[in-house]
Amino acid sequence: MEISGKNILVVGLARTGVAVARFLARNGARVTVTDLRDESALAGPLRELAGLSVRYVLDRHDEADFAAADVVVVSPGVPQESPYLQAARRAGREVITEIELASRFVTVPMVAITGTNGKTTTTTLTGEIFSACGFRTFVGGNIGNPLIELVEGGETVERVVVEISSFQLEWISSFRPRVAVLLNITEDHLDRYATFQEYIDAKVRIFENQESTDYAVLNVDDPIVAGIAGRVAATVFPMSQQRELAEGVFHRDGVITFRHQGREERFPTARFRITGVHNIENIMASLAATLLLGCDAKQALAAVEGFGGLPHRMELVRELAGVRYYEDSKATNVGSVEKALASFNDITLIAGGKDKGGSYAPLAPLVTERVRHMVLIGEAKERMARELGSLTDTRMATTLEEAVELAASLTEPGGVVLFSPACSSFDMFRDYEERAQRFRAAVNALGTGERP
């Protein structure tokens, strides 16, 4: 892609926008940056771009800028129906996201990973396996470093692994990973998409530009994902925990088996540090992607056995008076909470937060079977109570700290207090990490007489 001399509009000045603007300006583009925040709110990002030839339109957007740009690079947070983006499209301008822009400059094999749940764990583990197998590897995308930072920095790598969100996929046009992974699809982001089908359609775009020499790793245990197999041009490489596969990767009797073109590799799971049905899925996907792109099985197994998982995903905080307290703040949708509930019995569930628009009804069977008490918080608590409250003993709390104290008083020895919200955090907290720390502080204050 030739960018020198082109008029390029960068929409949004968060970390990714800064990296995009810097890369473009240093490579001769005529860059305009626009953001709805004012100069004082953007002091940090503006300092990072000091000395570069960049025009700023702050505290507003100007439709004329969108219509005049050769290319508009948009933040994933900007919805497709934005009138400014529609103005750009009407004027025949190219609208892309950072991941599309950056991918045009990547020449080494790329693994792109998406799904409603498990993306970050799978992306991180895939990078760990590649590195253990001796490949210089970049890991980023929707986590950590934006892909454009690799392009901008000029670092020489041999493999690229990126986590991709549905938002990032909305504006791709030529993005083509060598291996694309779709872990699962459950209802999520219905505060962004008008229908569940719109969300599915965005996810499936990860395969849009692949060819038969590429691979689509599909979790065929997920009926929606399985239904996509006939729609992709890439070679489908299935994964399953429910059946043995002649070609693909599957789990049976404590062993993950990889089969491809006559090659078979076996990976006993007994020494894995991360457990649970969902983590076996993540590990299978990582093994598939890395072995398809040249990794040695023994080195891959050693990397998996050494991987301890990521924070805020079903982490044991402490055990007190025979009750175990688990923090699962990253569980921001129903699908991830289903997997958490399936991992325990005798649960006191703390849930709630900012409502994302999906139904909580899929949780009903597990709530009925495994949840003894439920304590609800946040903006979503009333709707959650309407959909699930009749299935078990259900209480309301005003704060997370109050919810923890109430859960502690309700739970018998041998039980589990599980904080798995099924909602985003933005009604009460800065992000899911702050929410996690508040839960941990409240749990650690139990029995001390102290206020968290």
UniProtKB/Swiss-Prot annotation:
One Gene Ontology CC term in the entry: cytoplasm
Keywords assigned: ATP-binding, Cell cycle, Cell division, Cell shape, Cell wall biogenesis/degradation, Cytoplasm, Ligase, Nucleotide-binding, Peptidoglycan synthesis
Enzyme class: ligase
Gene3D superfamilies: Mur ligase, C-terminal domain (3.90.190.20), Mur-like, catalytic domain (3.40.1190.10), NAD(P)-binding Rossmann-like Domain (3.40.50.720)
The protein's Enzyme Commission number: 6.3.2.9
Pathway: Cell wall biogenesis; peptidoglycan biosynthesis
GO molecular function, one term: UDP-N-acetylmuramoylalanine-D-glutamate ligase activity
Reactions accelerated catalytically: UDP-N-acetyl-alpha-D-muramoyl-L-alanine + D-glutamate + ATP = UDP-N-acetyl-alpha-D-muramoyl-L-alanyl-D-glutamate + ADP + phosphate + H(+)
SUPFAM superfamilies, alphabetized: MurCD N-terminal domain, MurD-like peptide ligases, catalytic domain, MurD-like peptide ligases, peptide-binding domain
Cystines in this chain: none
Binding site for ATP: 115-121
GO biological process terms on file: cell division; cell wall organization; peptidoglycan biosynthetic process; regulation of cell shape
UniProt-annotated location(s): Cytoplasm
Reported function: Cell wall formation. Catalyzes the addition of glutamate to the nucleotide precursor UDP-N-acetylmuramoyl-L-alanine (UMA).
Protein name stated in the entry: UDP-N-acetylmuramoylalanine--D-glutamate ligase
Upper classification of the organism: Bacteria, Pseudomonadati, Thermodesulfobacteriota, Desulfuromonadia, Geobacterales
